[in-house]
């Protein structure tokens, strides 16, 4: 979570909404607190407003009956029936995979098989080799609906034509509810940091770590850039696991995570973060969450697979100041995310191309910004790599593409005793609630291992603070987007 400054105030340039709220209710409860005493959450009645060239538009709310009526008006009664079938399947997937995947410290194949056997309605989405886009083409006739629901693959950094059909469950995860955070998503990070300090955690923000010290076959300390050494019995690394494999925190850590846990890489992004006056016919209808679809998905994801910038990408626009409902007066804060290939170096023509392919298209669709953002408002894949060395600019960690991708993602325990993983690059994956769950899994692993070694008797049922515990990381003003 991060912000960048603007004349209208700090712009959230990372995640834009909160989903799976129960994860955070549970997290605050673990510390004996209530989330609502620390943050004001703004429920979004419309999950997203979807736009296509030619003027067609579809709002989705998460209410199956209401959404089916909207789909009927948008694409006809047959597609409304198809939507109901898809929604039922996605609901079944979400319920079946929650306990054996999301809530488990690692995906358990036996438990997954058992859960799936009891839900034959979800079997069509589990066929090996069937992509999410392929599955949706069997569900819907209207290509716009295929395009809309296939896009959920990008929420975890995958291409719809290569990501597995099981990712249809992301629709139901979002449909369970979307909240904006008053003041911006970074307020969640601030609230958690404040709570951690109250519990005795020593936060050292913007403190670079030079290496994780390995001695006698286990982690013994973390060495900071200024030479300070922090002895530890356990170290939780919340960066991209690819940094370990690249040796950025010490040669002795290269084999802590298998190569299959960090490659292939997920998508990156070009991200605009700025303040401006929105004008044009579409301006009154912009909401917090907006998606402007490309005319041809193949023209978007084909170039991405080749490491190129699409000529007509889909554009995600977060109008941050519209989360509470009324249209603000004066400049507003906006974040626009354009999918990008990982590992792409900055090229001289990239700014002009990305600017034209973003703002010329929006002008054609009836939306303009005054002033239009300059180069300093754009975060590129190469910038993300510099911010997160070893990541190749991927903002979702390992790619979710492939039938068994979820089993390849690294879990909390690494091959090096004393070293643990948390964050979007670890199980269960990318996204704010998933990263939070990864922290829960890492904490449980640390406590279990320390207890087994006779170093602690701490229980996970009540808040505890470990003397000398240290968290290092970046300030929230860094530039690193994630949806």
Where do the language-model regions lie?
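A glycine-rich dinucleotide-binding beta-alpha-beta segment and adjacent secondary-structure elements
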Residues: 142-156, 312-316, 368-428
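A conserved FAD-binding loop/helix module that cradles the flavin
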Residues: 15, 424-447
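Helical element adjacent to the flavin cofactor pocket in flavoenzyme catalytic cores
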Residues: 168-223
